Amino acid sequence: MRIIKYLTILVISVVILTSCQSSSSQESTKSGEFRIVPTTVALTMTLDKLDLPIVGKPTSYKTLPNRYKDVPEIGQPMEPNVEAVKKLKPTHVLSVSTIKDEMQPFYKQLNMKGYFYDFDSLKGMQKSITQLGDQFNRKAQAKELNDHLNSVKQKIENKAAKQKKHPKVLILMGVPGSYLVATDKSYIGDLVKIAGGENVIKVKDRQYISSNTENLLNINPDIILRLPHGMPEEVKKMFQKEFKQNDIWKHFKAVKNNHVYDLEEVPFGITANVDADKAMTQLYDLFYKDKK
């Protein structure tokens, strides 16, 4: 009987201790004691808007929020340094769904759960903002940010709907040495649609496709957008050289009418970001600058 009584007391004690530890852990989480490491610039900028501290940040030539200036770098978004991240003792390491497959080995080495967010479109990013707000106790900030983006989007869509003619747009996404054509499934394609442009590329199952200038000439867009990704100045020079040396471009209506525009990585980009309000506004102004 004494043994049974002793075991009963021991079990109760363990349950109480475990309960207390669980409660303490929940309180810690509720108080916002997260150690967050975003692995992409877009996520870093979003966390700043949600007023969240971070313990690690991606290595980037882009300017990150000043509040994170003393935060340690953890490497490139596609190749974060496992040991550098481990040293930070993170509770959450964040990435985007676009590179989920590529990031799985990284999370396996960390022995941590991967958190992936959709930044492929404005709608996807807004859903991710809500998820981040719920996850890190920033619901009010997430709602405020999404309300602002919705307001700008609605305003742009309403103005575009009143236009009698919508420009046909070709979007070129350049990297050093080459370029691809963006479809509606890409983030920039999504923005073009919101701003009242019609993407001349109708592919539905891919974000980007390889280019064929002869086929593009047959489509003959009203506007050509050139978006750099990585080393923007080098990519701009590449585009200028391509359009100057490849004789076929001079036959494009957009080139003849000087409707070829180089977009900046900020506020644009290949993934959605919190500067989407500025990007939508700039695109609308480009498309309808003669209609004001």
From Swiss-Prot:
Lipidated residues (N-palmitoyl cysteine): 20
GO biological process assignments: cellular response to iron ion; heme transport
PROSITE patterns: FE_B12_PBP, PROKAR_LIPOPROTEIN
Protein name: High-affinity heme uptake system protein IsdE
Domain called Fe/B12 periplasmic-binding: residue spans: 35-291
A GO MF label: heme binding
Keywords: Cell membrane, Heme, Iron, Lipoprotein, Membrane, Metal-binding, Palmitate, Signal, Transport
